[in-house]
C-alpha cells in the first residue's frame, strides 16, 4: 500500500485506540475522553512547519506542508500484539537519523517498567520473517501518561545509520542535542532498511506538550510497537552512512504528574564514554536507555512521524562519537560502567509536585496522599530479580533518591537484557524500614514487637528471652526444695523461701509468655502486673532473712516480725493498685519511685548489719556463712532497685519512648534481668542455709574419715596438750563428773600401817586441782558447766607420790615428833580432852574430810605432842609465861589460830650436831613454834561430843585463806 505523503502517525494512533479497547490506563490523567481530542498542529511565532517523513520501501519522502495529508493515514495492518520492546537490535543499514537539539533539565534513569530486551528471537520467528503468525487477540496493556484536551498525539520513529568499522562519513560537530526515541519490543517480521532522503529541517514549535503513549501487553509473545509523542524538535537530516552494526532502541517516557500542565519529553543526547571500542551488536543482549523528564517544559515543537518498519530504528550517534573520525554505536556500552549522574540546567517543576527523581511505575497504584513512591533502581552489578529466581546473594536494601531542591538530576545506566520480564515492584510505602545498627529512640525506631526486635538484635533477642525464662526456674526449684524439706525450720526462713518461689515463677512466666509485650498475648494491665510484682516479693524475702540472721543488731522495736508483716503487704498492694487502675503516668512513676526507695533502704540496712557482724564476730570463712550470703543479697538488691527505677521509664507513656526500641532500653532490661536472677539465687541459698540444722562440733563420720586418713602414731596417747587439771570444774564440782584420780599414782590407804591422809584418797587428788565448797551441789556425769577461770585453776601437776606420807616419814620420827606435822591431833590433845581432836586440813584438801572416832583414837595413840618434848627440858621464863586476860580463857582457840597463822619453819638438823635426842639440842635451835605453845591449863569438858568437832571445823574454814601461803621446809 502506497502511503500518502501527508500522512502522520497521529491518525494511526487514533485508529489503533478503538481496536485496542479502553483500559483503566486510558482514563488516568485525561480530563475528557480521548476521541474528543483532535490532533492538530498550531504554528506559533511566524515559524514555518516542515515535516519530512521518510519513505518506506523506496518511496519518496513526505513533506508536512500539504494539508491534505492529515486526513489520510497509512492503512498498514498493525500487529495486535503490542509490547514495550523489540526482540533484539536487528536494525538494517540505513541513513543517519534526525538530531533533536534542546538544552533542558532531564533525568535519565532506568525505570522498573522497562522490560528490556527479551532475548534473541526464537527459531520459529527467524524462519518466518515475512508474515506474522496469527495469535488470539488479548487485551493489551495500555499506559497513557498525562494529556489534555489540546494534547497532540503523534508518533515519530527516528533512526540512525549504524557505522561500519572504519567508516568516517556522516560526522557532525559536537553540540547539545536531545533525543526522543521509541523502543519497540516486538519482533517485526519484515526486515527492510529505511531510505532517508536528506534535506534541512526547520524548528517546528508547538503550543501544547505531549506525553508518551505506551501500547503493549505483558508476556513473552510477540509484541507490537511503541510510539512516543514528542515535544519541540530541532531536526537535521544527516547523510546516509551504511553500517554493519545496529544499536538498541531507546525508550522515551515522562512521569505522570496530576494537576500539572502537559510538558514535553525532551532527551538530551549524552556523549558516550571515550575510549570504548565499537563492537558488533549481540543478539541476546543489549543496553537500554530510558529517559524521563520532570516538570512542564516551556517550549513546544512539532512531531516527526514515520511509518512502522519491519526493522528497529538506529540511534544517531552523539557528537563525541564522531569527534574521533568514525561513529560508535550505542551497543558499545554493553558491560561498561554506568555514566555518573549529571546535573543539567533549565529543568522546571510545577509547583506542588513531589521532588522525586526516579520515575514511577506505569502500572503501580498511586499512594493515598497522591505523592509518587520512590522505586529502587538496579545497580550496575545487580541482575534483575523475579519470583522463583535463585539468588546467590541477599538483595540489596532499597535505594531511595534524596529529596533536593535542585532542578533536575540526570542518571544514565545500562542494563543487561534477560530472558524474563521484571515483576512489578512493590511500593515503598509497604516496605518496613530496617533500622541501622544504632537506631535513634524516636518515631523512626522499630516498635517493641517480636519481628522488628528479632531483626535488630538477631539471636541475642531469643537468647535473652528464653534463657532468662528458663534460668529463673532454678531459684524457684531451690526454694521449693527448701520449703518442702524444712517445714519445721524457722518461720522467717520458710516465708523467704516461699516468696522467692513465687517471684521466680512469675518472672519465668512473663518472659516465656509475652516478653515486654512484644507478642501482645497479654493485656497491658496484666503485663504491667507480671513485670512489677517480682520486685517487692524479692525485697520482702531479703528483709525477712535479714531480720532472722541479723535481727539482734537492730533496735528492739524493729526486731518484731509483725512490723515486716504489715509493711510488705502495703508495698505490694500499692504497686498492684496503681498498675491496674491508674491512668496517670505521673502517679505510676511516683509509686515506682517510692518502691525503689524502700528497696534501697532495706538493702543498705542489710549491708550495714552484715558489716557490723563480720567485724565483731569471727573472721573465719566457715564461722558464720549467713552474714556473707546476706551481704551479697543486699548488694544485688541495691543495684536492682536502681535499675528497676530506670526501667519504669519505658513502662509508661513518655515523650518518644512509648513502644519504641532504643539501645538504652535494651541495656537496662538486659542487666536488670541478670541482676534479678542472681538476686533470687542468693536469697534461695540464704533461706536454705537458715533452715538446715546446725552441724555438731565434730561430726562422727568426718572424725572417722580423718582418723582413717591421718592415723595417730603408735605409742602416743591421744591426751590433749593442755594441763590435766584444767578439766576440774568450778567450785561446786563433785567427784562424780571429773575424777582424774584414777590416772594418778597413789598409795593404798593404810599401807604399812600408815595413817590415811586426805590427799591419799581419790577425792584428795581431785580436790587438789579444783577446790569445792563443803556440801556443794554435785553435777551429773553428762552435764558441762562453764569453764573455770585462770584464777580458779590450780596449775600444779598432781604428784605421783604421797608427799604427806613421805615428809612425815622423813622428818618426824618417833624420837622427834610423835605425830605428823600436817595433822592437828597433837595440838588438839593439849587444848582439848583426849576424846576430842581433829586433823588440821591440808592446804587444798577437803575441809569436811575429818577422821571418824576410830581414826582419831588411832592417830591419837600414835601421835606425840611436840610440847611433851619441849616440857621435858627447861624452857625460858618468857616461853612458859601464860597469856594474860581473855587469852587464858580461850587457850584452845588462840593457840590454834596462832599456830595456824604462824609459818612452820624447820631449819635444824639434830644429826648435824652429833646429838641423838632432843635433850641434847640447844634451846636456841628449838623450833620457833614451840614458843607459841601456851602452858597447859585445865579446860572444861565440852557439853556434847560433837561440839568440839564443829568448832574445829569452823576454825579451819576461817583459817583456810591464811594457810594459802607456802610452808618452807629446809632439809
UniProtKB/Swiss-Prot annotation:
Carbohydrate-modified residues: 58, 369
N-terminal signal peptide: 1-27
Residues recorded as bearing Phosphoserine in the entry: 768, 780, 783, 789, 799, 806, 845, 865, 894-895, 903
Extracellular side, ranges: 28-467, 513-532, 582-588, 650-669
Transmembrane segments: 468-488, 492-512, 533-553, 561-581, 589-609, 629-649, 670-690
Low complexity compositional bias, start-end: 239-252, 427-445
Compartmental location: Membrane
Protein name as it appears in the record: Proline-rich transmembrane protein 3
Native source species: Mus musculus (Mouse)
Protein encoded by which gene: Prrt3
